[in-house]
UniProtKB/Swiss-Prot annotation:
The protein's assembly and partners: Homodimer.
Keywords associated with the record: Decarboxylase, Lyase, Pyrimidine biosynthesis
Pathway: Pyrimidine metabolism; UMP biosynthesis via de novo pathway; UMP from orotate: step 2/2
Originating species: Streptococcus equi subsp. zooepidemicus (strain H70)
Sequence positions that bind substrate: 11, 34, 61-70, 117, 179, 188, 208-209
GO molecular function, one term: orotidine-5'-phosphate decarboxylase activity
GO CC terms in record: cytosol
Reactions accelerated catalytically: orotidine 5'-phosphate + H(+) = UMP + CO2
Name of this protein: Orotidine 5'-phosphate decarboxylase
Length: 230
């Protein structure tokens, strides 16, 4: 189920910047892009509709975490936008995860966030009062996500093999924190290259700045895509 296209994180604050960026690509190129909280909260559903109108796939990364009824009804609204993938927080619990699935329906891919790739084990213990290892926490959340019949999880590429050994076949792992060889790792703490992520079993990878801030974003995208698929 591996997606051949790297997902481009559209970490822009405005509609105009998104339009300008997407206009760099050939009209017949079908991208897979991520809309995060900043962009969605700034521009609302119209930004999703616009990107879908261009024929691109949309990963709407809102990381919902609320009471089950609220998550269920919100997912029902999001499903009407024609999104291809979205997220919830695994920490919301199995009941909330199941409610999300019910609200979203069976079309879009629904994945749960385990631990953010910016989170270190020390931070997890101090801030979340979770005294296990980081990988144990991630694996626990992944198993609960599978139990709730979601499609997969967001996790570091370093955790993919451990997760896939413990969950049903077909359970997907989306990995942010991907950086081309030699690139600045930014605020990510657990990173891999696209080729390493493929070798370890990642199904989807997400990159932002290595593409969006490149001198030639189209060239950077195709170089990363080639590395991901070799």
């Amino acid at each position: 189920m591996r997606e051949e296209r790297p997902i481009i994180a559209l970490d822009f604050p405005s509609f105009e910047e998104v339009k300008s960026f997407l206009s760099l690509f050939p009209a017949d190129e079908r991208l897979y892009v991520k809309i995060g909280m900043e962009l969605y909260y700034a521009e609302g559903p119209d930004i999703v509709r616009y990107i879908k109108s261009l024929g691109h796939s949309v990963f709407l990364d809102l990381k919902l975490h609320d009471i089950p009824n609220t998550v269920r009804s919100t997912m029902a609204v999001l499903s009407r936008l024609g999104i291809d993938m979205t997220t919830v927080q695994a920490a919301g619990g199995v009941e909330m995860l199941r409610a999300a699935r019910e609200g979203l329906g069976q079309g879009p891919i629904l994945i749960a966030v385990t631990q953010l790739t910016s989170t270190s084990e020390e931070q997890m213990r101090e801030d979340q009062n979770i005294q296990s290892t980081l990988i144990a926490s991630v694996l626990h959340y992944a198993k609960r996500t599978a139990q709730a019949k979601l499609d997969g999880v967001v996790c570091s590429a370093h955790e993919v093999k451990v997760i896939k050994a413990e969950v049903p076949v077909g359970f997907v792992c989306l990995t942010p924190g991907i950086r081309p060889t030699g690139a600045d790792i930014g605020d990510q703490k657990r990173v891999m290259t696209p080729h390493q992520a493929r070798a370890i079993g990642s199904d989807y990878i997400v990159l932002g700045r290595p593409i969006t801030r490149a001198a030639d974003p189209v060239k950077a995208y195709h170089q990363i895509k080639a590395e991901w698929n070799r």
